[in-house]
Amino acid sequence: MSNLNNLRHKLQNGLIASCQPVPGSAMDTPEIVAAMACAALAGGAVGLRIEGINNIRAVRRATDAPIIGIIKRDLPDSEVRITPWLEDIDALSAAGADIIAFDVTCRERPVSVADLYQRARATGCLTMADASNIDDGLLAHHLGIDFIGTTLSGYTQATVPTEPDLALVTQLAQAGCRVIAEGRYHSPALAAAAISAGAYAVTVGSAITRIEHICGWFCDAIKQCETEKLTEY
């Protein structure tokens, strides 16, 4: 089995932990990101999604588990945020990423999806498309991108849904894509539903690694219960 096939095999039917702290939070240091990654692997995760060169370097030093690497940028002339530039591809490969993920949505962008893909292939890394809908995903699949993620489904519109896009997982899987389900998988049951829908693997982020979000969910539920009690009287 080749190294690339071995990497694909490691991820199949597994959990990928996205270790991306809230920017600027108490957890937002490379050392803590690496610790979160190791804890996720100890819990059974088979791969990691890591943002930022320093974070990837820290995680690479700590483990040889598969890393999906991204760089997020806020550009003045494009809504594309995930790995928008060719130099990002080079930097991610040099930092130790095994798989390079990039936005493949049909929006104004500084570099074409095809050029990003070709640059990533030239590094020897596997590739992942962060798609928002079936058209994005199929275009990426036809280019030859290794994994198609549902990462951006619901995030290119004004209102973000609360539930994951399982229908998109099914559509892409039926089209022959290796689908990495991602986006709003906040419970084990939803992650299992993604695999049942045909996902190759499932990425979970906030529900595992963003303490602020998790605490917020609990606090909101408690407040809702308190409100319901008050309305009974």
Swiss-Prot record:
Pathway annotation from the record: Amino-sugar metabolism; N-acetylneuraminate degradation; D-fructose 6-phosphate from N-acetylneuraminate: step 3/5
InterPro entries: Aldolase_TIM, NanE, RibuloseP-bd_barrel
UniProt-listed Enzyme Commission number(s): 5.1.3.9
UniProt entry tagged with the keyword Isomerase: yes
Source taxon at top rank: Bacteria
Biological processes per GO annotation: carbohydrate metabolic process; N-acetylmannosamine catabolic process; N-acetylneuraminate catabolic process
Cellular component aspect of the GO annotation: cytosol
Signal peptide feature range: none
GO molecular function: N-acylglucosamine-6-phosphate 2-epimerase activity
Catalytic class of the enzyme: isomerase
Catalytic activity of the protein: an N-acyl-D-glucosamine 6-phosphate = an N-acyl-D-mannosamine 6-phosphate
UniProt KW keywords: Carbohydrate metabolism, Isomerase
Transmembrane regions listed in the UniProt entry: none
UniProt-listed Pfam families: NanE
Xref: NCBIfam families: PRK01130.1
Role noted for this protein: Converts N-acetylmannosamine-6-phosphate (ManNAc-6-P) to N-acetylglucosamine-6-phosphate (GlcNAc-6-P).
Similarity remark: Belongs to the NanE family.
Protein name in the entry: Putative N-acetylmannosamine-6-phosphate 2-epimerase
Organism: Yersinia pseudotuberculosis serotype O:3 (strain YPIII)
